[in-house]
């Protein structure tokens, strides 16, 4: 089942990820906590209406543009037939179709030296759809549906046929020290495995720490149920800071931690760090290691390697 859950996450990211995520990854990993970021397109498809943009991570691309109506396209994986986004007014849609043909097995006789054996793999068919809408008095709503026909496919995925449903809601909600609420629900129903349900509820707020420095604090609750096994997580916490280092460079740090009430344990704090560079015509976002802070001058001026693990180049107009 762990393979199934990981596969679904990969498909949602690889099949319908239409925008830069490096900034969000460095700030805790949840795009919904940063409504102004283009990474929201993958959570709330209606966010495509806020941008004309083109970006790449060195392997894939995404571009969307338009005036009253937006259209966006991305390359996706080698077996993706189409990855499309659309937006108009307060609505948005992401659609992905993945089709990989069946490979028939070839078996060779022991005395046939010219024959090349081929391992047979079953065909793959994945339909991945997201719809989003901003509703007055309710907030931002995103709905996700995925239907797949997938089995062991060589070095790709090992995943049974099944269906995934998801719902995300974000709204302004003044409560205690927080300004916004985020609720998400996800249900994974593979044909031959136990269903998996995930439920999360978070409160978050942004902090004006100083000039050109913004912080985020989020706290929430999570519940996961897999067959007869359930796990309650509370509290889940995210703390992140983004600060202008110079007039063209931004430094980012994000920390997450969740406590399992069911197992009375935690994996501890998970840190992430990143940099953003504004080159005028485009923006470069990258994830970096914590050693950025041990020798910042040489790192930012290029005299020492940044040890960047991934990047995004984004152009907006």
Predicted segments with their positions:
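Outer-membrane beta-barrel architecture
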Residues: 62-64, 83-87, 128-134, 164-170, ...
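Repeated loop/turn-to-beta-strand initiation elements of outer-membrane beta-barrel proteins
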Residues: 54, 68-72, 90-96, 136-143, ...
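Residues that define the transmembrane beta-barrel architecture of outer-membrane proteins
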Residues: 59, 78-82, 123-127, 157-165, ...
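Detector for outer-membrane/organellar transmembrane beta-barrel domains
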Residues: 167-259
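Cleavable N-terminal export/targeting peptides
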Residues: 1-36, 70, 92-94, 109-115
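N-terminal, post-signal peptide beta-strand-biased segments of exported outer-membrane/organellar beta-barrel
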Residues: 17-76
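Sequence/structural signature of outer-membrane beta-barrel proteins
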Residues: 76-78, 100-108, 146-157, 184-194, ...
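Outer-membrane beta-barrel "beta-signal"
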Residues: 275-282, 288-290, 304-317
């Amino acid at each position: 089942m762990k393979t199934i859950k990981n596969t679904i996450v990969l498909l949602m990211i690889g099949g319908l990820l239409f925008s830069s995520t490096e900034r969000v990854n460095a700030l805790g990993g949840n795009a919904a906590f940063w409504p102004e970021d283009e990474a929201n397109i993958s959570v709330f498809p209606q966010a495509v209406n806020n941008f004309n943009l083109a970006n790449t991570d060195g392997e894939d691309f995404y571009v969307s543009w338009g005036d009253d109506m937006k259209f966006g396209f991305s390359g996706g994986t080698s077996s993706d037939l189409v990855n499309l986004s659309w937006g108009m007014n307060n609505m948005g849609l992401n659609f992905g179709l993945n089709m990989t043909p069946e490979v028939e097995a070839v078996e060779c006789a022991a005395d046939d030296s010219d024959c090349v054996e081929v391992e047979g793999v079953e065909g793959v068919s994945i339909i991945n759809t997201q719809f989003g809408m901003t509703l007055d008095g309710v907030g931002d709503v995103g709905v996700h549906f995925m239907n797949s026909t997938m089995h062991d496919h060589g070095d790709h995925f090992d995943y049974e046929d099944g269906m995934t449903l998801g719902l995300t809601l974000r709204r302004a909600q003044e409560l205690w020290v927080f300004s916004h609420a985020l609720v998400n629900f996800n249900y994974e129903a593979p044909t031959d495995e136990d269903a998996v349900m995930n439920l999360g509820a978070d409160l978050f707020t942004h902090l004006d720490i100083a000039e050109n420095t913004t912080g985020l604090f989020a706290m929430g609750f999570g519940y996961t149920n897999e067959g007869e096994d359930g796990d309650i997580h509370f509290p889940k916490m995210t703390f992140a800071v983004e600060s202008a280092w110079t007039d063209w460079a931004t430094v980012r740090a994000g920390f997450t931690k969740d406590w399992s009430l069911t197992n009375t344990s935690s994996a501890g704090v998970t840190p992430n760090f990143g940099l953003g560079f504004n080159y005028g015509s485009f923006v470069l976002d990258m994830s970096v290691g914590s050693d950025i802070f041990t020798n910042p001058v040489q790192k930012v001026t290029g005299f020492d390697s940044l040890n960047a693990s991934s990047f995004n180049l984004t152009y907006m107009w």
